[in-house]
């Protein structure tokens, strides 16, 4: 493998599981940073803000700051500013309040100061864009049906990702991609995807680090949206056998990863770091 100057890393299922560090992940990231490689944590997580994610990770011992983290919401905000400036947007998302990462996005259901208004007040508002984030309790029938109605009235459909599921301590859990398929079919509208696997997401990560695609490596547990999508963008892909990894998904994938390792703890050796590593990257 040619020498790399930067590493893009998915968080959930690669560094952590249910926000708890996976074995060896903290030490591996410290070693990578200590070797002087650039690091960007790239995640489709929509349940937490960048600041919240950074707080959890640093509390667990990971050497990261909020500036190291690129999330689907932050990329979505940039996408909307470029393609839908000033649009009135309805957000369908579960988890923490992520408005601080949606800088410049005008959301229904909030006044000019950002305070909550009547949660049902946006039903009859002319919505320009429906934004689909991550699944959870907020993905109830009423919320989905309201989004369906807004799409029927001409709103654009923008989704932060297409993830069908993610893994927690309780096993695989449904994610918003499963519901997005239904919205697309019912409304006869194809979603514009802003997070992984969109090329724009990886381009934003490379720009954030100031490196070319050939100088970077992407590590993920989702073969299609993390690894193969990165490879299409010219980035070397590494699949880990943790998180949502399933052998059957690996076998049925549309392509092959450049590299497969058991876990993120194996990455320093793959990069040629440490005493037990190869003398040169192959």
Short names for language-model regions:
Residues 1-11, 16-37, 46-70, 77-282:
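Asp-based, Mg2+/Mn2+-dependent phosphohydrolase catalytic module
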Residues 40:
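Conserved glycine-rich Rossmann-like NAD(P)H-binding loop of the short-chain dehydrogenase/reductase
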């Amino acid at each position: 493998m040619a020498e790399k100057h930067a590493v893009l890393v998915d968080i959930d299922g690669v560094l952590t599981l249910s926000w708890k560090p996976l074995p060896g992940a903290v030490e591996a990231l410290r070693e990578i940073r200590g070797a002087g490689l650039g690091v960007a944590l790239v995640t489709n997580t929509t349940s937490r803000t960048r600041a919240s994610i950074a707080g959890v990770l640093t509390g667990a011992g990971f050497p990261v700051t909020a500036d190291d983290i690129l999330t689907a919401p932050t990329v979505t905000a940039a996408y909307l500013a470029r393609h839908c400036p000033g649009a009135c947007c309805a957000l369908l998302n579960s988890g923490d309040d992520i408005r601080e990462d949606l800088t410049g996005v005008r959301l229904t259901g909030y006044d000019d100061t950002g305070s909550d208004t009547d949660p049902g007040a946006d039903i009859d508002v002319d919505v320009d864009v429906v934004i689909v984030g991550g699944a959870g309790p907020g993905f109830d029938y009423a919320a989905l049906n309201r989004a369906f109605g807004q799409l029927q009235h001409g709103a654009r459909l923008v989704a932060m990702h297409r993830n069908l599921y993610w893994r927690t301590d309780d096993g695989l859990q449904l994610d918003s991609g499963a519901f997005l398929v239904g919205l697309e079919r019912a409304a006869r509208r194809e979603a514009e995807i802003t997070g992984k696997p969109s090329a724009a997401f990886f381009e934003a990560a490379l720009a954030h680090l100031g490196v070319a695609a050939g100088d970077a490596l992407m590590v993920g547990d989702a073969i299609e949206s993390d690894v193969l999508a990165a490879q299409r963008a010219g980035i070397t892909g590494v699949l880990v056998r943790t998180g949502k990894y399933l052998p059957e998904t690996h076998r049925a994938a549309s392509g092959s990863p450049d590299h497969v390792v058991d876990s993120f703890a194996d990455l320093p050796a793959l990069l040629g770091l440490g005493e037990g590593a190869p003398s040169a990257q192959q």
